[in-house]
Each structure stands twice: as structure tokens, then as C-alpha cells.
């Protein structure tokens, strides 16, 4: 056909009367809503002028004494205001936390004031420190120190432990530290010593004594090594 002038032009599509459906998440986010929400952080500046980053959480387990819910930021501000009643400075916090008996008394006093195990565990989540020590919660809220994972803390402490304990003691302390890393600071409680010895030595306390010395010596080793987990130089090099 001499008059043919090419393929017919398709008509332009008519615009939809409905707006385009929005992407359910931002472009860079392709994870479940709960995971995305967990990553959202907000900056909280406390009375010392230093900022802390906390997870944005819609629901927390914090409550005012009158039973009304409390936000994570309000709880952090309350804890920050109360901590000077328990220790005067960072050095005193480290000293109290470095021994099982004084640490237990500190935790007991905190619980009496409304800062119990459940609340402290919740605060661990909020500052994204679930793999850290409860010490890190207190040090972060009180002094804005960056949390350090239990694994890193244990790894750095082993250097000091190798200089202060014999080989058999080091083997046992490595075993203790593995439980500390996996479970938490409660594995360093004094009442956990005997269960840990039984676990390590297959229920034979006699074997433990043969390796580690008299019971009082074992107790001193167990309590004495813990200060190396909380030295300032460990925190200074996260």
C-alpha cells in the first residue's frame, strides 16, 4: 500500500483516577516491620548535656508509681536522676560492680527503688545492649559510656587473667567467662560458684580442690578475677 505510513500509534494510557499505591517501607528498608522499628533510634539528652541513643519502642514495661505507663525516655531520665544515690562516680561504680557481694547489694538497693531485674533488662534492649553487662546499662545512663559486649569484655579481661592466675585457674576462669558471655553477669554471682565447679569437674568437688586449691582459695580466685572485667582501660578501647 503506497499510502501506508508505518505501524499504528497506540493510544496513550489514560491516567488512573487512583493515586499510586505507596511502598509499604522506605526504599532502603526491606525487613519486617518489627525489625525496622527496632532499628529506629532517637537521641535523648540528659541533664549532664550528653546525648544517649535509645531504641524507639512503642511499648515498654515501665510504670509510674501511680500505675500509669512511662516512656523509655522518662525511665532513663528517672534512673539518671537516682543513680547518684547509689554511687558517687564512675570509679565507685566499677569498684562496687567488681566484687560479687557488693554488686549483689547494689542490685538489691536498685530493685528496692523500682529498678529491678525486669526493668534493667528492658533498659538493655532500649540502649541496644542486650549482649552487654548490666554494668554497661548503669555506666551508659550515668556517664554516657559506650556499651561493650560481654564477649569483648571477657576477651580483654583474659589478658590480665593470664598474668595473675596459674594455668589450671585460667582454664576454670575461661569456663566461667564462657558462661558469663552466654548467659550474663548473674553467672558471676557468688552462689553460682559451686554449680559452675560441679559442671566443670563433673560433680567432683574433690577434683576441683586438687586443681584449684582449698575452697576458700577457689572463692578468692572466683571473686578476685572479676575486677579485670571492669577496669577503665577495657572500657576505653571498645
Regions found by a protein language model. Name each.
Residues 6, 10:
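Acidic/histidine-rich catalytic neighborhood
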Residues 12-238:
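Catalytic cores and motor modules of nucleic-acid processing enzymes
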